[in-house]
């Protein structure tokens, strides 16, 4: 059975890329005849993002835009979207056009065919690709992911990658969310893993933004990533399975 896909796009001051991002997603999903909605969460933008979205909504009938009802911030915007999407599964997609719309199709079909609860992206496995990844950010990424792999005993090598797809029931089983910032992209997959949901990972492509400024502040995120990583580690070892996925009898 086909599932309705929600593509969740948090957007803060993305006037330079939001049109390209929405149209890119829409064109691919229509071509592949995938039932979908494109849910853009306007994260308190002060530029022309809202104006552009209003115009794009006349061209892209599957576009639904909402305003972030929570405080400003990437994690808050994603949480707002996760509380409001209406699909059977949801994929997090960056507004800066750094993700590839083609990967949505591959992940969607794998989720259905394998009956997985989640599908994760890896930019560093064979078939994955990064374009113009900043060297300092790349080095920190590899160190962080190596630490996570060691602590959790994982083969998966790109937990910090935001590009992932989840079934709606899986998202429900990951609540309540703790992270309010970019560390939410680590909280979600680690909870999938420690709570016993089924998952696989596929290669995906990432390219550095061409317009606008990155919203990720590395100096501010270190302690937040550490908090989430060790929270999930404690949940794994100390909660005696209280949060594990309920088995269907």
Question: What is each residue range found by the language model?
Answer:
Residues 4, 113, 227-249:
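Terminal low-complexity segments of carbohydrate-biosynthetic enzymes
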Residues 36-39, 50-84:
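Conserved donor nucleotide-binding strand/loop of the catalytic core
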Residues 66-84, 89-92, 98-182, 208-219, ...:
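Acceptor/aglycone-binding surface of glycosyltransferases and processive sugar-polymer synthases
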Residues 157-158, 196-206:
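Catalytic beta-strand/loop signature of glycosyltransferases that borders the donor
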